[in-house]
């Protein structure tokens, strides 16, 4: 099993450009696995972890409802935002500057073949990062992501998850609000959940955050949880 993971911080990158890059990496892993099956070989598969930020964009998962986008295309243009229907799970979400978007493109057969464990590890990496800043976050039963004050009227989400998995190869991932402009979430019903709010690390701590520092903490927790070697 190859537990080496190539890490790339892509910085601020167009959503479609990054999506195409993910698809190329994802397809490359699947091709190796297909060849191994057909030829009864054991060629190692690569693993990748991408961090990035996106210009303002809304994405709708394959099980989502377009009615959860509350504004029209003209309004999106006026706010410098775009909209994409994509092939991950989940409903609608927002990406923008100040948000850490993580795309683990992993052959889970190098780690473990349990999609629920995979999602819980992604959530746990964010929960542990928030703990580093003195914040106590949690999961919400029946919902993915990372939350504060679950079960109260002030329940609010700081990290959303949406992944695709095929033959144990993952793509897409998580969106962690650090210095995000939360007003953009007002244009959607985030993740299709009507009665919940969203928040950011900046809002919780009342100050602009060093996003590079947050990325480093997050990466450290991912490395430990998945027992990976960054290359």
Regions found by a protein language model. Give the residues of each.
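N-terminal lobe of the biotin/lipoate ligase/transferase fold
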Residues: 1-155, 209
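Long, positively charged amphipathic alpha-helical accessory segments at protein N-termini or as interdomain linkers
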Residues: 2-10, 110-158, 163-231
């Amino acid at each position: 099993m190859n537990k080496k993971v190539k890490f790339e911080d892509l910085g601020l990158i167009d959503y479609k450009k990054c999506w195409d890059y993910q698809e190329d990496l994802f397809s490359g892993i699947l091709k190796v696995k297909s060849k191994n099956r057909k030829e009864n070989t054991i060629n190692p598969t690569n693993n990748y972890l991408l961090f990035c930020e996106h210009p303002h964009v809304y994405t709708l998962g394959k099980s989502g409802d377009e009615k959860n986008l509350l504004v029209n295309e003209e309004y999106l243009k006026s706010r410098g935002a775009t909209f994409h229907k994509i092939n991950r799970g989940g409903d609608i979400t927002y990406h923008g500057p100040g948000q850490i978007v993580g795309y683990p493109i992993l052959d889970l057969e190098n780690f473990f073949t349990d999609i629920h464990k995979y999602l819980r590890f992604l959530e746990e990496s964010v929960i542990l990062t928030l703990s580093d800043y003195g914040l106590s976050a949690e999961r919400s039963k029946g919902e993915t992501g990372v939350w504060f004050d679950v079960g109260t009227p002030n329940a609010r989400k700081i990290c959303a998850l949406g992944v695709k998995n095929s033959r144990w190869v993952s793509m897409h991932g998580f969106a962690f609000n650090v210095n995000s402009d939360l007003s953009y979430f007002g244009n959607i019903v985030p993740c299709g959940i009507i009665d919940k709010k969203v928040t950011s690390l900046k809002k919780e701590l009342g100050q602009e955050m060093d996003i590079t520092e947050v990325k480093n903490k997050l990466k450290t927790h991912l490395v430990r949880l998945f027992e990976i070697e960054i290359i």
